[in-house]
Amino acid sequence: MEESEEPADAGQSLPPVYIYSPEYVSVCDSLAKVPKRASMVHSLIEAYALHKQMRIVKPKVASMEEMASFHTDAYLQHLQKVSEDGDDDHPDSIEYGLGYDCPATEGIFDYAAAVGGATITAAQCLIDGMCKVAINWSGGWHHAKKDEASGFCYLNDAVLGILRLRRKFDRILYVDLDLHHGDGVEDAFSFTSKVMTVSLHKFSPGFFPGTGDVSDVGLGKGRYYSVNVPIQDCIQDERYYHICESVLKEVYIAFNPKAVVLQLGADTIAGDPMCSFNMTPVGIGKCLKYILQWELATLILGGGGYNLANTARCWTYLTGVILGKTLSSEIPDHEFFTAYGPDYVLEITPSCRPDRNEPHRVQQILNYIKGNLKHVV
């Protein structure tokens, strides 16, 4: 793996907070789309002994009142009812986005409250000055709307985390590096100039959620405070980092954020079943380092990532980046060791698919964004 000359959190004496408890991991393991992913991620972090270099904080479960800081009472009450009954055929469920990619399985409300509470706990650690970086790898469910589940997301923990951080920090920057557009977070803050959302994502006809073109810039007082970077298939580390750094450099100057929420969905990584981008953890790690050098209060979230072993590889590598640690290439022996065959290494090799992002189109998008950011005051 790439060498780190100095810790990414150099100058920050406080260790990162790592949101974890066995109970929390067990609840997150139950999500049907990513079964046991939370355990795989934590076990690999533990196998590299990274947990010993972080402050482990047990998450609280979100209260109904905390969840209602964004979601409607009607949606939360319906989610709770179908969760208790395990009723996936309730006639009102379609209205609330439940079914198909968000099935109303038994216990889903408890899962949503656990994830929401974990991200709120992480945000509170930053508010309390307990750390400069707080990590909730099982968070980052960025598609949920205030009254609707969407795209495997039942509760928008990212929005709840931002709302909690707003109690202390005046201007919050949300950066979303998931394969999919962070539409739920953008929608939540599309009318405000206090939260800027930046999303790099695949934008292609028929690809979920279908929003996030470069011309989508926010509304009303929030006009120009939504930044969307549409990307085509097969992008690799070097070009992705060039785009990310170019955008974030301009965003930082224009917006002057006081805290950052960073969603690091691993469905961009080569080998993901989404079969779209062609990234490795090293490329995402460079983007992460760029943000960490601002030395702002930073809340780190997971998100997508459907090749479970590669997602664990990615988030473990990124945890190492946060700690300024170079990790051994060889996967240590641990509970899920056999999932990392046939090579049993931390590195992920990109495929040979050609990058479909034409340099002149990329430059057009960057110029458009730079022009829009001139309106940010």
Swiss-Prot record:
Histone deacetylase that catalyzes the deacetylation of lysine residues on the N-terminal part of the core histones (H2A, H2B, H3 and H4). Histone deacetylation gives a tag for epigenetic repression and plays an important role in transcriptional regulation, cell cycle progression and developmental events. Histone deacetylases act via the formation of large multiprotein complexes. Also involved in the deacetylation of cohesin complex protein SMC3 regulating release of cohesin complexes from chromatin. May play a role in smooth muscle cell contractility. It holds the Pfam family Hist_deacetyl. GO terms for biological process: heterochromatin formation; mitotic sister chromatid cohesion. The lineage of its organism: Eukaryota, Metazoa, Chordata, Craniata, Vertebrata. This is Histone deacetylase 8. It is found in: Nucleus; Chromosome; Cytoplasm. The keyword Transferase does not apply. Residues 14-324 are annotated as: Histone deacetylase. GO terms for cellular component: chromosome; cytoplasm; nucleus. It comes from the Eukaryota.
